[in-house]
């Protein structure tokens, strides 16, 4: 992975003239701005809610606008269109309108019937969230995972998994978070690994958790 050294690296960089990035987070802003810097004539953010609901930081959105990013808000992707050669030539979209707030507290997007249109692009970049690689659970049956597919650990203070000698930390445990938290998890796991190599002790994932202490009585 040496693309950062281009042009002194053999790592290929894909360049496109019309790029659509589906999503509204910080990574989506990074992707669409990078597309412009690589020479795209048009770079779009396709987002199904309004500008006020964009989850990206305000400064990210402002900087993207200053660089020339075009925002296709209240727009949901329907399907990617390809030509006979198998290359992307368009993105079919549907106009949306905002209804009542959903469980996240943001107003729920509702499709407008008959509002389909095609955005002419030659590249579509999905940026709609992150998740754990399902291969982890499929190939490691003797390790426990959470309902969302993340690795279960004793605690973030040790990073000890249910598989003896295996430690985990960062996004694969907490879900998408920050580099600082991941670095902290690595440091904590490093100390736990050092202890394990010295004494060989491991925790029992099946041991009952200690009961929480009852609250102290209030003395009047």
Where are these regions (language model features)?
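Rossmann-like NAD(P)H-binding beta-loop-alpha module
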Residues: 5-40
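Rossmann-like dinucleotide-binding cores of NAD(P)H-dependent redox enzymes
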Residues: 32-79, 201-219
């Amino acid at each position: 992975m040496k693309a950062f050294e281009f042009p002194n690296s053999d790592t290929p960089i894909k360049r496109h003239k019309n790029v659509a990035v589906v999503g509204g987070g910080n990574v989506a802003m990074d992707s669409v701005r990078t597309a412009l810097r690589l020479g795209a004539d048009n770079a779009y953010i396709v987002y199904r809610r309004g500008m006020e609901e964009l989850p990206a930081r305000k400064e990210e959105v402002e900087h993207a606008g200053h660089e020339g990013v075009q925002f296709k808000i209240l727009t949901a992707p329907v399907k990617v269109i390809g030509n006979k050669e198998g290359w992307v030539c368009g993105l079919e979209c549907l106009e949306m309108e905002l209804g009542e707030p959903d469980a996240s507290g943001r107003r729920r997007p509702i499709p407008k019937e008959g509002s389909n249109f095609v955005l002419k692009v030659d590249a579509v970049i999905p940026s709609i969230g992150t998740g754990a690689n399902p291969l982890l659970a499929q190939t490691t049956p003797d390790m426990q995972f959470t309902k969302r597919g993340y690795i279960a650990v004793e605690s973030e203070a040790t990073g000890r998994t249910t598989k003896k000698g295996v430690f985990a930390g960062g996004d694969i445990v907490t879900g998408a978070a920050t580099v600082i938290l991941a670095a902290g998890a690595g440091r904590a796991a490093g100390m736990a690994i050092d202890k394990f190599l010295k004494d060989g002790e491991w925790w029992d994932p099946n041991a009952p958790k200690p009961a929480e202490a009852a609250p102290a009585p209030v003395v009047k």
